[in-house]
Amino acid sequence: MPPLKSSSPGPLGRWLPVLAWAGIIWTLSSGWFSGERTGAVLLPLLSALFPRATPGQLDAVHTGLRQLAHFTEYLILSVLLYRALDVERRWSLRAAVLALVLAGLYAGSDELHQWWVPGRGARASDWLIDVSGAAAGQGLLAARAQRFRPRPA
């Protein structure tokens, strides 16, 4: 009987999701996803869902949704980076820190990209939200590793 293959993906299987997600983030940083354009879609929807909300309240919800998107994008990127870096398949502080640093650097490059996109802008607050999402991703992975850690006999 032939030996079973390892379920651990190779380098391409680990890094392709990272590259694909980074491409999605880059696309979301384009002018197509500016506040003005997302507002044109979301504000009428929010207005229909919350007919008594003031325009200021609707704008605040729209802004909050955009910030939640930043947070979530980088939470996912951070988890994918960790998966690509953690070849041993057991929780590693080194891989977690490196994933967080790489996600933070990509977030910085994303903000610089937005600086040049009409209708977008670079904001330190967006970068902090991005890095917070990446840190949350690493926190979730660490908590999961702690929960499923083998207990000493």
Regions from the PLM with identified roles:
Residues 20-25, 95-114:
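Small-polar-interrupted transmembrane alpha-helices in polytopic inner-membrane proteins
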Residues 107-131:
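Interfacial helix-loop-helix junctions of multi-pass membrane proteins
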Residues 2-5, 149-153:
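Short, charged juxtamembrane terminal tails flanking transmembrane helices
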Residues 2-78:
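"…centered on the first transmembrane helix and the immediately adjacent amphipathic helix/loop
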Residues 96, 101, 122-149:
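Functional transmembrane or membrane-interface alpha-helices that line membrane-embedded catalytic
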